């Protein structure tokens, strides 16, 4: 489906293919603006949302967790990415000390995106427990009815804890 050979990909009713998680979640949020999962286009808040989505995609996903899944990368190389993740989670932990969600007090698609990506920590044995604000944040998101419903539908319940397995 995705010509690049990876997920996610969304095929719209008219056959249009949309790829990349950040683009997909913004598109979905824009279809139901009354849910307020994304600030209105053209606002500074929307730019901040895009900044968080880019941070999740580039710093946590592609530049952090993804290389840890590749068997061909030696441990010394993987340690570079683990160190990057430590720095990024320290940053997130500090931000979440005074913010309920990435955008402050309002849940957004950036939170959904980070929740999914941060679930990979247990699969690559990256311990999130030192980042207590991140762990609390993940708990808040993981107990949301829509999140639990989606995770049950995908067979992901129980969702990974903060501890590596």
Describe these PLM feature segments.
Residues 89-103:
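Hydrophobic alpha-helical bundle segments that form small-molecule/ligand-binding pockets
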Residues 65, 94-97, 146, 152:
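Charged/polar positions within long, soluble alpha-helices
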Residues 23, 133, 146:
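Residue-level recognition of oxygen-bearing side chains
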Residues 64-65, 102-130, 135-143, 151:
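GST superfamily/GST-like fold recognition
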Residues 150-165:
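Terminal-tail/helix-coil boundary detector
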Residues 1-89, 93:
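GST-like domain detector, emphasizing the conserved glutathione-binding G-site
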